[in-house]
Amino acid sequence: MGKYQKNIGAARRITVMQYLETYHPGELVRKTDREYCTRTHDSLIITPANGFFHWFSRHVGGNNAIDYLTKVEGMDFVSAVRLLNEMAPVA
């Protein structure tokens, strides 16, 4: 497996919750005992048990931090992978 595939794989293993707890801890709001939303987007629901998020008002969702960064924060894929690799460096 090449370096880029390892970087992408490591980034894909980071959950939305891990990303938000690290970079935006004040943004998470517990909605129920199983779900969170964010202070900025109350229709964006995160379910930690399965790793999914869904932003109901925008009709987008995903299951990892790359999806969140590209679909919610508008970051390009390469920048998202680079940022997440800072959290989980590839050996």
Predicted regions and their residues:
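N-terminal structured subdomain of primase-like DNA metabolism proteins
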Residues: M1-A91
